[in-house]
């Protein structure tokens, strides 16, 4: 009888140990993100860029700037496992913030890291209807970003005049670690400052509790999942709001077999031809690539 009790106790302790390990170091699951685009600031910058290049359209933007919302928020889901991630929008979940009014779940972070608020959230073992969300609940016309972490490649599926599936190698990002920390979705995250090969400045907050080197908008290269991503130059921010650990692999049924496949660089060159002559340069191509990814 004593041996039986001991066996039960050992079994319970082992189960609790495994459960704790799974809860704190989960490498499969779904992360809900708020993607916040600061519309006015973004349009103001575009107008200034056009004005500096002697383009008449720049002044046209300024006339309508006061009528634009301060920001626009899209809800995104990031599905992840040890080897891959898929980021796609939820259906009908965008919100706008007019003239500084209204609620916004994501904190505001400037390039120097000041301002904003801590992000609360829930963590759990949900996500059992993951594939159903992809087939029925996801925005089928929305952009989908896929990372193959093992192969170091990415696919971007988007719908313009028709559906395209663009392939690209994951570019390295140079990261510089700081001693600043922020709580995002209930997890303590460390801030790092980064730069892409095209010198686009990034601010990221990653969590070692999720040992997957990935994040939203094809971000990667850190010793943990990126739960906060800020692109100051583009006035775009991603903030995790909820994390659900599961046993599911990243789904693959998001791909449309009818999508037109090409390299990302080919796509950039193709659409660059429709831009004004004075914008057919490397800077314009860079802008196109940034718009596709972020």
Give the residues covered by each predicted segment:
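Surface-exposed, gly/pro-biased binding rims or lids
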Residues: 209-239
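A general structural signal for well-ordered alpha-helical packing
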Residues: 189-191, 226
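Short, surface-exposed, low-complexity cationic segments
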Residues: 195-216
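Extracellular or lumenal secretory-pathway regions
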Residues: 19-188, 195, 201-202, 231-294
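Bacterial Sec-dependent N-terminal signal peptides
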Residues: 1-26, 294
């Amino acid at each position: 009888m004593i041996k039986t009790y001991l066996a039960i106790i050992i079994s319970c302790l082992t189960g609790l140990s495994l459960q704790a390990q799974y809860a704190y170091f989960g490498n499969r699951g779904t992360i809900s993100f708020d993607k916040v685009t600061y519309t006015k600031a973004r349009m103001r910058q575009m107008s200034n860029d056009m004005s500096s290049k002697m383009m008449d359209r720049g002044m046209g933007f300024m006339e309508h700037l006061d009528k634009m919302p301060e920001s626009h928020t899209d809800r995104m889901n990031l599905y992840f496992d040890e080897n891959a991630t898929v980021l796609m929008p939820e259906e009908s979940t965008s919100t706008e913030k007019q003239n500084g009014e209204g609620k916004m779940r994501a904190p505001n972070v400037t390039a120097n890291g000041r301002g904003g608020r801590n992000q609360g959230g829930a963590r759990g073992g949900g996500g059992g209807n993951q594939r159903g969300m992809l087939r029925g609940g996801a925005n089928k016309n929305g952009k989908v970003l896929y990372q193959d972490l093992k192969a170091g490649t990415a696919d971007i599926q988007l719908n313009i005049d028709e559906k395209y599936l663009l392939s690209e190698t994951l570019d390295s990002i140079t990261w510089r670690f700081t001693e600043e920390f922020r709580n995002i979705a209930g997890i303590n995250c460390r801030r790092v400052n980064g730069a892409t090969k095209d010198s686009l400045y990034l601010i990221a907050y990653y969590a070692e509790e999720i040992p997957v080197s990935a994040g939203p908008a094809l971000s990667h290269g850190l010793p943990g999942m990126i739960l906060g991503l800020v692109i100051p130059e583009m006035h775009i921010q991603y903030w995790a709001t909820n994390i659900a650990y599961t046993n599911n692999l990243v789904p693959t049924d998001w791909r449309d077999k009818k999508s037109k496949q090409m390299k990302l660089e080919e796509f950039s060159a193709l659409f660059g031809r429709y831009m004004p002559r004075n914008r057919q340069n490397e800077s314009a191509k860079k802008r196109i690539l940034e718009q596709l990814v972020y």
